[in-house]
Amino acid sequence: MITRKEMTRMLLKEGLLSCLANHSFESVTVTLLCKASGITRSTFYLHYSNIMEIVDDLVDDAIAYSKPGMVDNNNLQTIANTLSAASNSVSLREAYDSIFDRLPLCQRIIRHKKYLPLFLDEQISEYVLQRIIGREKDRQGLVIAESLGISFDVGVSVFVFLVHGLYAVNKQYKWSQSDEWLEAQKIIFELVYRGLQSR
């Protein structure tokens, strides 16, 4: 059974997502958030000291929803080869779905549209990306380092580059996972994999 505390936090998180659909993060005040959530300011301050704490909770929820992905030394190769084998948009979508658990966390999170407002707002999107990078960098950096024979720190740098690049492409396509977007994903993963292979 859900506790009152959990219910209140859930209402505030849903309220913030609702506010972000119509307002910039910068313009969301505690008063506006409380009105959208149907709770009082004093109740807000019993659970959070500021709105960024709700953003943190939402990112944590999105990460938990997305579940840990499959990561191994052949991850990039598996993704690139699976997508490359697709001959048309239908088989490409099927290929993408088949390797979905291997995709970087930033790609898996956006599949759940509920969390999309966190990525759409210019003021908090970089903060959200940094939280995602912080959660994944040790695991992803190590895999990249081992597969390329480079230092862990350089592996993390490659991972950060990939996350920001994929974010930029998602933003360019306005977060719609269209056939054209999917083709771009295929080319990006092929390009990165081939580039790393030539090293």
Label for each model-derived stretch:
Residues 1-23, 30-32, 36, 40-199:
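Alpha-helical bundle regulatory/interaction domains
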